[in-house]
Design a protein with these regions (language model features):
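Short beta-strand-loop/turn "lid" adjacent to the catalytic site in phosphate-handling enzymes
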Residues: 64, 68-101, 130-134, 161, ...
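Glycine-rich beta-strand-to-loop/alpha-helix junction loops that act as flexible
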Residues: 79-84, 213-214, 262-265, 412-420
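A charged, well-structured terminal subsegment
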Residues: 135-141
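Short alpha-helix plus adjacent loop in nuclease-associated cores
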Residues: 99, 103-116, 451
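Short glycine-rich phosphate-binding loop at a beta-alpha junction
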Residues: 72-80, 156, 209, 407-417
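N-terminal glycine/serine-rich phosphate-binding loop of ATP-dependent small-molecule kinases
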Residues: 1-96, 108, 125, 225-235, ...
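Short glycine/proline- and acidic residue-enriched helix-loop micro-motifs
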Residues: 45-48, 120-130, 206
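Active-site core segments that coordinate phosphate-bearing ligands/cofactors
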Residues: 2, 9, 21, 114-127, ...
Length: 499
């Protein structure tokens, strides 16, 4: 039997984080959650910040547990959300906690940037990244306009996973996948775009050296070794952007696949050799984010389970206020009720602006259906059926666009993330898109993180061996398309309702 090798993954999301111990032996992997913790926004002075020092402390706490158990880990890897960053001064010290992408300081800044610096069309032509007001390009510009003191004193600018790796090793890098979310990176050159960097009043050297996933950043500093009880463990640049790590974990057999990272927010896309930047991708606001081994993740953001989660929270709050039994609000009960309802009574566009953050999601759905002349949902089951069917129809629209963009056939749709556990939505997606769906893994981000560490250690040759190991370690659930005529008719209704 092959000796088991251990790897330590740090997986940070916008609301919570985890440290995970991954092991690899005999062509299979295993995961063990070491710690789980909240990632809280700090609100002060009308701004929202991330507590980078608290996150560092949580990583140290996870590493201490590993040391206490006497486990030898080969390496450490960190993935996080994109866009946000930390300023470091010339002495190597972090300049205050980083602003969070949810902070309102970027509202209205995009249009000012286009008017005063570089046009919208040219920015997309250079980066191929969808326009979001919180992209790093606009965050830094907003801070420059405001005379931000930390920016003015910054010697280095590090994206969040790179900042945490820096705190562990003392080495500053710029990992490719997370840098691609900034809207400053040019995928054609594989580096930050000089014109965009200069438009912010910065120099290229203020960002770290561009580093590809599965590269060694350095080893734990002596200080961190003393804090944790570990030796000089290597820290690896994995795919620092969590979605890139998740897509690396798609257990595909060849390149002819699409993926759907399904959670509160969903991302549907394809893996390509080159960025797709043209008039149609610009018009439809598709994005080209960095993948591993030189690939591009060509994708589009979708609302995901956000609407369902918000409705369920409202119902729970109402039940609590009225001292009602909450059994009917269990996830399984709600899905069972949804399946009892007539099909396609009510259809919404999940990405309509009215569902972005309404005071009442239930009321927003009612008003949308009333406005479009449809049956207005009344019961929990009717609401859930409406949400799941509408999501599947929106997935179909984007899958149809992806088929037009791809220069290869899309024979399968891989669904990864927490949403892959919703078997009814998986079947609806297969039916709606007319394609075989393979669901799993649920823990895609952590798995991708660990597999890239294994690649850096020399245990894995390339992405396809990585994906084969993942496929060998999991039992994927398969969903074949059914009810074509009914879904075709519903899709026509969706397009009319959507407008």
């Amino acid at each position: 039997m092959e000796q088991k090798k251990y790897f330590f993954a740090v997986d940070l999301g916008a609301t919570s984080g985890r440290t995970i111990l991954g092991s690899l032996s005999d062509g299979k992997f295993d995961l063990e959650e070491m710690t789980r913790f909240d990632n809280r926004l700090i609100e002060t002075g009308n701004h929202f910040y991330w507590d980078i020092f608290a996150l560092f402390y949580e990583i140290i706490a996870g590493l201490k547990l590993v040391a206490q158990r006497g486990i030898h880990i080969e390496s450490i890897g960190i993935d996080t959300w994109g866009c946000d960053f930390v300023y470091v001064d010339k002495n190597g010290d972090i300049l205050r906690n980083p602003l969070a992408y949810r902070d309102p300081h970027t509202f209205g800044v995009m249009e000012k940037y286009f008017d005063e610096k570089i046009s919208r069309e040219k920015v997309y032509e250079k980066t191929g990244i969808q326009f979001m007001n919180f992209n790093s390009l606009f965050q830094i510009y907003a801070m420059r306009k405001a005379g931000n003191v930390a920016l003015e004193n910054a010697d280095k600018i590090l994206f969040i996973p790179d900042a945490l790796s820096y705190m562990l090793t003392g080495n500053a890098i710029c990992e490719y996948t997370v840098a691609s979310t900034s809207q400053i990176l040019n995928p054609m050159t594989g580096d930050l775009d000089n014109e965009l960097v200069e438009s912010l009043g910065l120099k290229r050297e203020q960002f770290g050296k561009m580093t590809n996933p599965a590269s060694i950043i350095g080893t734990l500093t002596e200080e961190v070794q003393k804090m944790t009880g570990l030796n000089a463990v290597p820290v690896i640049a994995v795919a620092g952007h969590d979605t890139a790590s998740a897509v690396a974990a798609v257990p595909a057999k060849n390149e002819k696949f699409a993926y759907l990272s399904s959670g509160t927010w969903s991302l549907m896309g394809i893996e390509t050799k080159n960025a797709i930047i043209n008039e149609k991708s610009y018009e439809l606001n598709f994005t080209n984010e960095g993948g591993i081994e030189g690939t591009t993740r060509f994708l589009k953001n979708i609302c995901g389970m956000w609407i369902y989660e918000r409705c369920r929270k409202e119902w729970k709050d109402e039940a609590t206020a009225n001292q009602k039994d909450m059994k009917s609000l269990n996830h399984e009960e709600l899905i069972a009720e949804a399946m009892k309802q007539p099909a396609f009574q009510s259809i919404i566009n999940p990405d309509d602006a009215c569902f972005a953050n309404p005071s009442s999601m239930v009321e927003a759905i009612k008003q949308y259906c009333k406005k479009t002349g449809q049956h207005v949902p009344q019961s929990y089951g009717e609401f859930c059926r409406c949400i799941f069917e509408s999501l599947a129809l929106r997935y179909r629209q984007i899958f149809t666009w992806l088929k037009d963009f791809a220069d290869f056939d899309l024979n399968v749709l891989h669904i990864i993330g927490g949403g892959s556990l919703n078997q009814y939505l998986n079947q609806f997606t297969a039916d709606s898109c007319g394609v075989t769906v393979l669901a799993g893994p649920q823990e895609g981000t952590a798995i991708g993180n660990i597999m890239l560490q294994a690649k850096a250690s020399g245990l894995i040759k390339d992405i396809w061996e990585m994906r084969q190991i993942i496929a060998n370690s999991l039992e994927l659930k398969k969903f074949e398309p059914k009810n074509k005529e009914a879904w075709d008719e519903a899709y026509e209704k969706f397009l009319k309702v959507k407008g």
